[in-house]
């Protein structure tokens, strides 16, 4: 079958339209059986008037680009408006996110849930900044039996009874010692990915495929063949140095990337690039909501800060007593670590820095653009 997909990550109206145009014949007829489209939250209200999806996957609601969205309630209101534009659309919702779950319950669309019911991390007292501390239904402070990360976990409101539903697609027997391994009911999933957040991504794919009636007999093989989008655990080998590139553009995503870095106990160099172009969001105060102090235990031989807001990033690290080297030019920063580094380099970059860094690494590795 043929699928329309905005694989480049262009997730606003123009990018969505372009994905369909590229899959159309000269007469305007689509050469596709399915469409799988990522849509920017704020763009849903602009896209949905043009077509009504059969399904929408709601993965989580985190603060992102404060100057553009403001607080999380703005994003929730936009999504609620979009849902009302497509009343027959079915939702697949992350049950572990109280905000996504409330949004589904508060609208008339039919919904199905996915999530992880078992406690994976034993540490209860996390310093992470969490959304959804208070019940969206009655305003009472939420209580948690455990957290996975950010506000994701097993929650309930002690006053009105709003609580995490039991997921229809429930990940269990989680094992992250060698890639990712877990069960969904009687189905066993094995994937060569890192990062706890990827369990959620795979669960969402499994659930969406199940709801759409797509056969799952080749699910693990397809996972094995899939190459993640650039900047998502993207690995390079350059002059004997292992280079891992990851996009980190909000507190929750950054904390997950730091966690992935820390699963590698070998000595390493880390480069953090922060820009403040319009696509990044010009307000970088979110850096203060990231648990950078965890990097003290990352076995980092060096940490370099780069990009337009490298001074802000350096100041943020200074406040948790982490020394860093300042190099605004990302190419020079990379070359320095290739020449005098540990041969194990991690790059954490926000949105506009991703494309520049990716192209530099491809050129250094000798790949075709």
Language-model region placement:
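Cys/His-rich short segments
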Residues: 117-180, 192
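Active-site beta-alpha connecting loops in nucleotide-dependent enzymes
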Residues: 229, 247-326, 364-369
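Residue-level signal for inorganic ion chemistry
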Residues: 38, 59, 92, 201, ...
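Phosphate-binding loop of NTP-binding sites
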Residues: 1-115, 123-126, 130-134
């Amino acid at each position: 079958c043929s699928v329309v997909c905005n694989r480049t990550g262009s997730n606003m109206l123009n990018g969505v339209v372009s994905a369909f145009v590229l899959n159309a014949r000269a007469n305007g007829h689509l050469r596709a059986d399915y469409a799988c489209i990522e849509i920017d939250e704020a763009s849903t209200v602009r896209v949905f008037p043009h077509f009504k999806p059969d399904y929408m996957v709601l993965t989580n609601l985190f603060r992102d680009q404060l100057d553009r969205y403001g607080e999380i309630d703005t994003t929730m209101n936009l999504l609620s408006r979009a849902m009302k534009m497509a009343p027959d659309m079915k939702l697949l919702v992350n049950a572990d996110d109280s905000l996504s779950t409330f949004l589904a319950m508060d609208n008339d669309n039919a919904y199905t849930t996915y999530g992880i019911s078992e406690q994976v991390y034993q540490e209860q007292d996390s310093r992470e900044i969490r959304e959804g501390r208070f019940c969206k239904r009655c305003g009472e402070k939420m209580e948690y039996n455990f957290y996975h990360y950010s506000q994701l976990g097993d929650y309930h409101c002690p006053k009105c009874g709003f609580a995490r539903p039991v997921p229809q697609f429930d990940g269990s027997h989680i094992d992250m010692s060698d890639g990712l391994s877990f069960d969904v009911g009687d189905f066993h999933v094995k994937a060569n990915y890192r990062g706890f957040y990827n369990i959620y991504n795979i669960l969402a794919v499994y659930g969406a495929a199940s709801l759409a009636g797509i056969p799952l007999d080749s699910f693990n093989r397809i996972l094995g063949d899939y190459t993640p989008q650039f900047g998502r655990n993207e690995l390079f080998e350059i002059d004997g140095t292992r280079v891992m590139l990851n996009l980190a553009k909000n507190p929750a995503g950054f904390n997950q990337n730091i966690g992935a870095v820390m699963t590698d106990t070998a000595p390493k160099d880390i480069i953090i690039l922060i820009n403040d172009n319009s696509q990044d969001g010009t307000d970088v105060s979110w850096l203060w909501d990231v648990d950078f102090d965890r990097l003290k235990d990352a076995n980092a031989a060096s940490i370099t800060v780069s990009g337009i807001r490298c001074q802000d990033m350096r100041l943020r690290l200074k406040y948790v007593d982490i020394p860093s080297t300042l190099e605004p030019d990302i190419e020079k920063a990379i070359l320095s670590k290739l020449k005098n580094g540990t041969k194990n380099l991690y790059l954490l970059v926000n949105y506009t820095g991703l494309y520049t860094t990716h192209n530099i690494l491809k050129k250094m590795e000798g790949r075709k653009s």
